[in-house]
Amino acid sequence: MNEYQFVLPYPPSLNTYWRRRGSQYYISDKGQKYRKDVQQIIRQLKLDIFTKSRLRIKVIADVPDSRRRDLDNILKGLLDSLIHAGFAEDDEQFDDIRVIRGVKVPGGRLGIKITELESV
């Protein structure tokens, strides 16, 4: 079982990550920037491994301010960005997902720990 730990920037809210035009959804400029930032970090860490394994992810969400937040709203943008960056093939691979509220940190950040549950 391989384990990977790294830190990512705090994602834009779900409402600002996705946009809608008519009946079509697309990723906003903020969402595109976040995806590129995550891709750059994943490549720098040489984690663009396209794993096929089943995965467990633990996220420590250090929030950027004192506003009330639904922690589950960070998951879609985060997982989408990890897949786009080449860490795994599909967000369907995540069998165990935990999000824990951390402390307030200016700008926010996500502490990520991903464990491969089985090799394929």
Curated annotation (Swiss-Prot):
Which coenzyme or cofactor does it need?
Answer: Mg(2+)
**UniProt-listed Enzyme Commission number(s):** 3.1.21.10
Pfam families, per database record: RusA
GO MF annotation terms: crossover junction DNA endonuclease activity; magnesium ion binding
The record, for InterPro entries, names: Endonuclease_RusA, Endonuclease_RusA-like, RusA-like_sf
Tell me which stretches of the chain form a coiled coil: none
Which SUPFAM superfamilies does this entry report, sorted A to Z? Holliday junction resolvase RusA
Keyword Metal-binding found: yes
- Which residues bind Mg(2+) per the record? 70, 72, 91
Any single biological process term in GO:
DNA repair
* Keywords from the named record: DNA damage, DNA recombination, DNA repair, Endonuclease, Hydrolase, Magnesium, Metal-binding, Nuclease
Its domain of life reads: Viruses
Q: Name the reaction it catalyses.
A: Endonucleolytic cleavage at a junction such as a reciprocal single-stranded crossover between two homologous DNA duplexes (Holliday junction)
| Family in the record | Belongs to the RusA family.
Subunit-structure text: Homodimer.
Entry protein name: Crossover junction endodeoxyribonuclease rusA
Tell me the organism. Answer: Enterobacteria phage HK97 (Bacteriophage HK97)
**Designated gene of the protein:** rusA
